[in-house]
A protein has these predicted regions:
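Hydrophobic alpha-helical segments, principally membrane-spanning helices and signal/leader peptides
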Residues: 1, 25-26, 137
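Sec-dependent N-terminal signal peptides
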Residues: 3-14
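Generic structural signal for beta-strand residues in well-ordered domains
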Residues: 13, 29, 82, 141-142
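Sec/Tat signal peptide C-region and signal peptidase I cleavage site
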Residues: 16-20
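Active-site-proximal alpha-helix that buttresses catalytic centers in soluble enzyme cores
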Residues: 22-121, 127-129
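A generic secondary-structure signal
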Residues: 78-81, 135-139
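Internal catalytic or translocation cores that form aromatic/hydrophobic pockets or channels
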Residues: 130-134
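Active-site-adjacent alpha-helix immediately C-terminal to a catalytic or transition-state-stabilizing loop
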Residues: 137-151
Length: 151
């Protein structure tokens, strides 16, 4: 089922008038619904994860800073302020992604196919995850034409 119009959101620094036009256009697109919205986790200082990384232990991961928590709140406020309908929020199992989803949208479900395969430790999962993500999107049913958010 071809449900989604794909929308790529890129935040760049532009002049105020261009940003206002882009922002209005973006809001209009999201208000229409039926979009697949990819959101990267909010600010978590550094890159990658420590060598002792454990998916089930947030203390071994890079987590949101206070600035990141404020960013996540701002994301949620943006959707509420603009009355952008969300059907479902899916997050990877990484703590910074779950925390972003929780702060911004409150309700979310984790899906391992959204997990990072950035490091060599997880690269072996890439093909399986991409296939599962494509399958999920292909079979996703949304009768209310709301948006699907992936963090």
């Amino acid at each position: 089922m071809k449900f989604f119009n794909f929308l790529i959101i890129i935040f760049i620094s532009l002049t105020s008038s261009i940003k206002a036009d882009l922002n209005e256009n973006l809001i209009n697109q999201l208000e229409e619904g039926g979009k697949l919205i990819f959101i990267r986790h909010a600010y978590a200082p550094g890159s990658g994860d420590p060598n002792n990384f454990n998916l089930n232990d947030c203390s071994t991961q890079r987590n949101l800073s206070e600035e990141g928590k404020k960013q996540a709140k701002s994301i949620g406020k943006f959707f509420i302020k603009n009355e952008i309908e969300i059907d479902k929020v899916l997050s990877s199992e990484w703590c910074r992604c779950k925390e972003t989803a929780k702060i911004a949208f409150k309700d979310y479900t984790t899906k391992s196919f959204l997990n990072s395969f950035y490091s060599s430790k997880f690269a072996k999962n890439k093909d399986k995850q991409v296939k599962a993500l494509k399958e999920y999107i292909k079979n996703y049913k949304n009768n209310n034409n709301e948006n699907l958010v992936l963090v």
